[in-house]
């Protein structure tokens, strides 16, 4: 998945307010990547996808984690406010073709 595809994907999954937040997070992630010598595209991709599961319900997030327990890393035992990142990383790997472990870790 490239940055354009990620941007289109999250646009379709998020409310206007959350989408604007996500674009601002991407800008900050790129600034931080530049400052610390990290790959800017990877930082931007992770930032774009992190909140991609933020607006789905708890039951759907639970189902995603249960369908992929090997990727959920005990997600259900974690506080529910962090479930969206775990689920976003699972979806990125299983449905959206993201394979880079650093990106997936940053999404989660």
What is the predicted function of each stretch?
Residues 1-15:
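Generic N-terminal amphipathic, Lys/Arg-enriched alpha-helix
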Residues 8-12, 35-108:
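Divalent metal-dependent catalytic cores for phosphoryl transfer on phosphate-bearing substrates
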Residues 4, 26-27, 85-87:
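A generic alpha-helix surface/boundary motif
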Residues 21-22:
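N-terminal glycine-rich anion-binding loops that anchor highly charged ligand groups
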